[in-house]
């Protein structure tokens, strides 16, 4: 009986060859996909990087343009301000009351400066033949001198208002500090009102002196 052929089966070899070829094709295709994906990712990265750079440059140019526009507006406004003539300052308004007050002060000053001095305001020349003592006594060499001295005293008593201003000033100088010390919480107007009330009943008031003199007669 003859031996069987020990060689390779042709069909099996063909199948294996086809399988190996299919595997090689599949592996090559997969490798190509991997490489394509790699290069595609790299392209995307490059594209994103380029886009970021482009956006950054665009923002820089926009900021530069805005700065230029702002500077242009400032320069334009500055030119307008320099070209515009400055208006003179408007004079401050004066009220009618202020005008009247100024006129009254001027009239008072004029009346004070132009007012002729009376015999009471004129300095008295010393008369060796007649002098009035502090106690109110009159020293005279003759009867005529005594009558003249008494006449002057009567003239002063007849017009006490002429001595009011000086007497009140002296009264205020002495008593105002005392009132301030006694009433530290009062305003100046209140202190002056209180001082006036004290003055009206003070024996230093020439008007009160006149009444006292009349009552003594």
Swiss-Prot record:
Coiled-coil ranges per UniProt: 46-82
Coarse class of the protein's main subcellular location: cytoplasm
InterPro entries documented for this protein: Ccdc124/Oxs1, Ccdc124/Oxs1_C
Record keywords, A-Z: Cell cycle, Cell division, Coiled coil, Cytoplasm, Cytoskeleton
Biological processes, Gene Ontology terms: cell division; transcription by RNA polymerase II
Places the protein is found: Cytoplasm, Cytoskeleton, Microtubule organizing center, Centrosome; Midbody
Residue segments, region Disordered: 1-128
Membrane spanning stretches: none
Pfam family, one: Ccdc124
Record keyword Lyase present: no
A Gene Ontology molecular function term of the record: transcription coactivator activity
Biased composition regions of type Basic and acidic residues, renumbered to the chain: 18-45, 52-74, 95-128
GO cellular component: centrosome; cytoplasm; midbody; nucleus
Biological function: Ribosome-binding protein involved in ribosome hibernation: associates with translationally inactive ribosomes and stabilizes the nonrotated conformation of the 80S ribosome, thereby promoting ribosome preservation and storage.
Quaternary state and interactors: Associates with translationally inactive ribosomes in the nonrotated state.
Family: Belongs to the CCDC124 family.
Protein name as catalogued: Coiled-coil domain-containing protein 124-A
């Amino acid at each position: 009986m003859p031996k069987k052929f020990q060689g390779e089966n042709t069909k099996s070899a063909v199948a294996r060859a086809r399988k190996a070829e299919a595997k090689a094709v599949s592996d090559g295709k997969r490798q190509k996909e991997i490489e394509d994906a790699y290069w595609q990712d790299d392209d995307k990265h490059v594209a994103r990087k380029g886009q970021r750079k482009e956006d950054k440059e665009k923002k820089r140019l926009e900021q530069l343009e805005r700065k230029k526009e702002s500077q242009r507006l400032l320069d334009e406004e500055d030119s307008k301000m320099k070209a515009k003539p400055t208006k003179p300052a408007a004079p401050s308004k004066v009220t009618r009351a202020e005008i009247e007050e100024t006129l009254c002060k001027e009239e008072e000053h004029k009346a004070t400066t132009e007012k002729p001095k009376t015999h009471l305001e004129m300095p008295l020349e010393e008369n060796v033949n007649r002098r009035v003592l502090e106690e109110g006594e009159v020293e005279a060499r003759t009867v005529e001198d005594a009558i003249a001295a008494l006449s002057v005293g009567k003239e002063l008593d007849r017009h006490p208002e002429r001595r009011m201003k000086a007497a009140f000033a002296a009264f205020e100088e002495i008593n105002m500090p005392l009132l301030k010390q006694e009433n530290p919480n009062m305003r100046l107007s209140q202190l002056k009102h209180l001082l006036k009330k004290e003055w009206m009943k003070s024996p230093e008031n020439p008007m009160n002196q006149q009444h006292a003199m009349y009552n003594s007669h």
